[in-house]
Structures are given as C-alpha cells and as structure tokens.
Amino acid sequence: MPTAPQPLAIEAADGYRLGGLGWFGAPGPARPVAVIHAATSVQCRYYSRFAAWLHARGHDVILYDYRGIGLSRPARLRGLRASWADWGARDAEAALAYARACFPDRPLDAIGHSFGGWAIALAPSAVHLRRIATVGAQFAYWRDYAAGQRWPMVLKWHVAMPLITALCGYFPGKRLGWLEDTPAGVVRDWAWPTPRFETRPGGRRLLREQGRYPAAAVRAPLLAISTTDDPFCTPAAVERMLAYFPASPSRHLRIAPGDIGVAQIGHFAFFHSRFEGALWPLVGDWLAAGAEASRTASAR
C-alpha cells in the first residue's frame, strides 16, 4: 500500500507560508531526498502518484505549491506579489532549504517540470544539489514554440492571457479551463516577449538582488527530458535554459511518442500514471545512479 503523504508548512525567507506534501520513510544517511518543482499554475498534488512511486524506489520526496497556487493560495489573489522570479528565488529556494534543514546529511536531488526546471535555476540552494532532472523545462520564449502552433500559442498566452489579467487583477484560469488562477506578476513574466529571462520584469529585479542567477554556480549533473510533441519545449527552448547552467554536465534526452508505442505525450502527460512503466524510470534511474536510462527513448 502506498505511503500517505504528510502535510508540510514551509516558510519562505520573506515570511510567506507555503503548503506542501511529504513522503518520508525510515531515516538513514544514504536515503536521498527529492524536491519536485511544479509547472506554472499546476497544483503540486498533480505529482502525487509520481512522488509515491519515487518514494517506493528509495527517495524521500517533497512537493510544494508556489505562492498563489493550491495549498499556498491566499484568500485573495489580486495584489499578491508573486512573479516567476519569486517562485524561483523565494519559493523553490524555501523548499530546497527546508529539505536541507530537515535532512542535512542526505543527498538532495531536484525534479522540475516546465517552469519548475527554471525555478531551480533561480534558487540559491541549488548549488547543493546532487542531481537534477527536468521535464519539458523552459521559460516560454515565444519564438521557441513549435512552428506549426506558434501563433495560436502567442495569441493565447502572450496576448489574451495578459489582457484578461489586466482586467481582472489576476488570471482567472479556472473559469476559463486553462490553468489554476494565476497571480498577475507570474503572467507578466511569462508573457514578456524577450529571449533572456534577465530582461523580463521579475528577472531584472532578481538580477539586481542576486548579482547573477544561481544556475551559474550549479555543478550537479542535469538530465533535460523533452518530447517531440510538446509545442512549448522545442530543442531551442531546452538549449536556451541549459545555457544558464554552464557548469552542470547536461544531457538533453528527446523522446518521440512512437519510441514508447503511444500516439502522444505532450507537455503535461509525462507525470500521468499511465507512463509509470515507460517514462518514469527515465527520471528515477537518473536520480538513483546517474544512469541515462535510454532503454525506451532515443537521444537527439
């Protein structure tokens, strides 16, 4: 029977309280800890089955919600200070620091989905990571979107979303069936049309505060996984993100749905339980031993 998660309360450096979930087993210095960083406006509960699976394989696992989302949502989103920069430098940092404080002698790994991979790049404690795995990770530069879907995506995410956000004071994603409701500052960072994160509103502010992004000092080996049918995460988008990790030995593993005998995977389905056998071991094997786990996927 899967272990039930424990509710977590994680306090960021600015005092904001984040909600999360933890899967913990018998303590031991060799048992690694993995922190999972979610995609933009995806509740951390979405990753619960994957977290339970990873826990059964020998990791303790921490999930958390960014400020404004899920277990970390306040009563009112309008006026909430929350940007992609805050989600990385404050919230992802808080989760990694929490893991280090609770388990100071354990190996620490990180998994990032979509924006979650970029959140790791902005967290100072990422320098302490042993290994990193990302899935569909990028920071939404519009020219990197898949050519056949680029303009509809630009219209939706870079025109309609910021306009609706300006009218409402936050993005009412639930009502539209797009995402969770999302803070305005996050939408601003996402929709900004520049290819470098440091030229986006949150990125500029963060660079002034940090001097450089923590990713520059990260040395943990990094496996970046993408799929050929993910319109957000093209090879150009992955390489754009990996360029911020110059000291990390990195490998980009690109998977076609046909490699595992399915019609589609897309941007979100990697963590669906139907891919427990075909895709999850790519991450699990990498974290466990640094294995490239290319049995089911082809590198491109």
Please give the residue ranges for each predicted region.
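Catalytic active-site module of serine/aspartate enzymes centered on a nucleophile-bearing elbow/loop
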Residues: R251, I255-R300
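Alpha/beta-hydrolase-fold enzymes
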Residues: I111-E198
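Short alpha-helix in the alpha/beta-hydrolase fold that links the catalytic acid
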Residues: T234-Y244
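Conserved alpha/beta-hydrolase
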Residues: C44-R76
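N-terminal cap/lid segment of alpha/beta-hydrolase-fold proteins
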Residues: M1-G25
